[in-house]
Amino acid sequence: MSTITVVIASYQYGHLAAHCIESVLCQSRKPDKILFVDDGVGDCGHLPKIYPEVEYVLREKNMGTVANFQDMLMRVTTDKCMFLGADNWLRADTLEILDKIDADVVVYDIVVTGDSKKGLHDRHGNEMTSYQGDLYWTRYKHHHGSMLYKTKLAQSIGYKGTGGKHSEEDLDLFREMKNRGAKKEWVKEGLLYYRRHRENFIKT
């Protein structure tokens, strides 16, 4: 069985992070390591006392998404890795399902929730269906930021920004993996709960 690290990344999500951490700790297939990073906000200082089994990087200064993700990626020593926004959470059998798949990168479907989910539906409605009051977002032939991938392959590519309005570091990584012939598999199950909430749109 391969080893897995889950990197939980927070920026102004300290009020939601415990929910995310709990969803990783309760996985039916436990991760071998959990790394948590607060990118210079300072709202996650309460977490180490509650969840001492998690390894923390609590930055004093903000590095920005791309540099932060790249730094955390290079800290990973397990066979596989997943990045997870601290405002989101996983279904309890996610790692068990994904770890059984022989691939360089595994993408799976998303359940979009939260009081701002409609905005995402307005842009990607052709990929979404109603699901238990939320939205089911198929990622067939696509990517997302919480895909599970082989660490050494990802580290050889690295997270890079596009320089545009959105950094798209995860899309850039996914495309380069495909360019290098990576084997990609898709799981037709909504394993990631993607929370669209007001903090997503607050500018500081």
Spell out what each predicted region is.
Residues 129-148:
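A recurrent flexible, glycine/aromatic-enriched loop bordering the glycosyltransferase active site
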Residues 165-173:
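Acidic donor-binding loop at a coil-to-helix junction in glycosyltransferase catalytic cores
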